Amino acid sequence: MPIVSRKIRQLNAKAVTVSGLAAGAAFVAVLETDLRLTGRNVDDLMILGRPFTEDPSKARAVGMAIHVVNSLALASLYARLEGRLPGPGWVKGAIFANVENVILYPITRFEDVHPAIRTGQVDRYFNWPAFRQSVPRHIAFGAVLGVLYDRLRLG
């Protein structure tokens, strides 16, 4: 019996790259804003980079590099899944990014092994205030990703 193959939709590399980078920038803009407004030091760039270096300024730079790679990877995944999500691009993107957040957030339960949390360089993540702080970041990421991806892949 033959195996039924699905035609895998060709990704538009420009749409994925531009929308992913712009979405990542939106995430960081909201992150920087909420760090200042809330007074809660829930810094994802430090969390990503600190395991690789002890210097806080270098940790944020390394974290930014990792964030860029993550943004591009998520944009690629979004491009594969967006046709299955309801609504206009910004809604699809916001749903996608917040589902990713909900799926991965339980990892923060193991925060005690993270060097930046152990040394007090960032606040604890495994709590409701920190989770709530992550939601606008993911809404911004997803909305920008969805809108730009739709516009760029179609035009």
Q: In which residue ranges do the predicted regions lie?
A:
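Short amphipathic, positively biased membrane-proximal segments
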Residues: 1-155
